[in-house]
Structures are given as C-alpha cells and as structure tokens.
Curated annotation (Swiss-Prot):
GO terms for cellular component: CHRAC; nucleus. This is Chromatin accessibility complex 16kD protein. It is found in: Nucleus. SUPFAM superfamilies: Histone-fold. Histone-like protein which promotes nucleosome sliding of ATP-dependent nucleosome remodeling complexes. Part of the chromatin-accessibility complex (CHRAC) which uses energy/ATP to increase the general accessibility of DNA in chromatin. As a heterodimer with Chrac-14, binds DNA and facilitates nucleosome sliding by Acf. As part of the CHRAC complex, required for oogenesis. InterPro entries: CBFA_NFYB_domain (IPR003958), Histone-fold (IPR009072), Transcr_DNA_Rep_Reg (IPR050568). It holds the Pfam family CBFD_NFYB_HMF. Residues 117-140 have a biased composition (Acidic residues). Its main location: nucleus. Keywords: Nucleus. GO terms for biological process: chromatin remodeling; DNA-templated DNA replication. The gene is Chrac-16. Residues 111-140 are annotated as: Disordered. The lineage of its organism: Eukaryota, Metazoa, Ecdysozoa, Arthropoda, Hexapoda.
Length: 140
C-alpha cells in the first residue's frame, strides 16, 4: 500500500470537470482591479488554464529533478529551481523564490548595509550641511 509507484502518472484526457474550486478562482479573479464581469465561461476557462499551468510547472520540476525515476516526492526546492532556471517563468520569481538559510540572508543584509553605508555617508554629510545652513538662515 505504501510502496512507490512503478509508473509515472497517466495523462488524463480533458474533461468538463475542474479540480480547482470555481468559487475560489472567482474570488481570486475579483481581487484584481482590472477584472470586469466574470461569466461562467470565462471562469471555467481560467480555471482550466490554471490547472494546465500548475500541471506544466509541476511536470517540468519533476522531470528536471527526477527524470524518469517514478515515486519520488516533489518539493518546494524543485519548483523554485525550475522558476529560477527558466526565463519564461521569471514572473514567478517573487512568488516562488529559492530558499536560503538564515545565516546566508544575514550575510546578504550585512553586505548591503556596508555597501549602502559607504554611499549613504557621503550623501548624508551633504544633507546635514544643507539642513544646518537652512536652519541658521531661518533663525535670522
């Protein structure tokens, strides 16, 4: 019962049924300001397109990571690698970023601060001088 599958999943033919709940897709579509009237036909097509896209993304991640080895579990890291490697998926970079460890993030912050502080120190000195000049002029 708990044995891994020996064959990859069988492709299902297109049907009039959806796996994603239509009401949830409608709610997500309504959250966009650009969305006008959402007819049942549009809702159905959008849901089917979303399902096909998710299938494509998961299939690409699975194939790239495991090749023809069946029974392996697909993980977040696999999806993020596919998103980061494929130019046509770069719109998902902020939604599916690659995971990094806390110490890596802290190091990135430290480097950004040190690089930013060098630039900011030069700019801040000029701003402070201008502020003190304008304050002395307003006092007179």
């Amino acid at each position: 019962m708990g044995e891994p599958r020996s064959q990859p999943p069988v492709e299902r033919p297109p049907t009039a049924e959806t796996f994603l709940p239509l009401s949830r897709v409608r709610t997500i579509m309504k959250s966009s300001m650009d969305t006008g009237l959402i007819t049942n036909e549009v809702l159905f097509l959008m849901t089917k397109c979303t399902e096909l896209f998710v299938r494509h993304l998961a299939g690409a991640a699975y194939t790239e990571e495991f090749g023809q080895r069946p029974g392996e579990a697909l993980k977040y890291e696999h999806l993020s690698q596919v998103v980061n490697k494929n130019k046509n998926l770069e719109f998902l970079l902020q939604i599916v970023p690659q995971k990094i460890r806390v110490h890596q993030f802290q190091e990135m912050l430290r480097l950004n601060r040190s690089a930013g502080s060098d630039d900011d120190d030069d700019d801040d000195d000029d701003d402070d001088e201008e502020e003190s000049e304008s304050e002395s002029e307003s006092d007179e």
